[in-house]
Amino acid sequence: NLLAVIEKELALKKSEANAVIPSLISLFEGMGERPRGRFFEGPEGAKAMRDEFLKVKSKMIYGIVDYDKLFQYWPGQQNDYTSVRAQKKIKTRTFYVSKAPVKDANSKEFMREAKFINSKDLDLGASITIYDDKISISTYSANPISVIIESDGITKTVKSIFELLWSK
């Protein structure tokens, strides 16, 4: 009967899968650190991602940001996020891209050190933020896409490049 044939076939497939699973698990575990990625979409996702920054354990955030685009898409950034970050005593060190230097880019009140990059020299389509063992990348648009990558090795590499450039 057809049902018996299907049951026998399924039992065989189950047996084959059970035989392969331990070696797959062993292979996967032997790969070392596996980065974890999280995706965020739309304005709500961008806000959720910024809320993640406020949970930083090291109390230090590094960033590469296009101020002109940031304030175009999130005009309330200073009040909505920066003030809260400063209240939580989270410092930031930022390379900011803009058409001209911004008056209060360096701010003790907002716990921010900043270095200017002229937008003629660098066109950013996304911001990059480095904190703890995470890197976030978020596009500038009315419907932004953001990703957070959690990886100690990747974060150390990007942070080392950031610090090298900062020291120049």
Predicted regions: what is each one?
Residues 20-23, 52-54, 130:
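Short hydrophobic/aromatic-rich motifs at helix boundaries and adjacent loops
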Residues 115, 120-168:
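Amphipathic alpha-helical interface segments
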Residues 26-124:
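Mid-protein regulatory/catalytic core that forms ligand/cofactor-binding pockets
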Residues 2-36:
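Short, charged amphipathic alpha-helical surface segments
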Residues 4, 11-12, 48-51, 145-146, ...:
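A compositional/biophysical signature of low hydrophobicity enriched in polar/charged and small residues
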Residues 4, 11, 40, 72, ...:
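Charge-dense, low-complexity intrinsically disordered segments
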Residues 11, 75, 79, 152-155:
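Short, conserved loop/turn and helix-capping segments at secondary-structure boundaries
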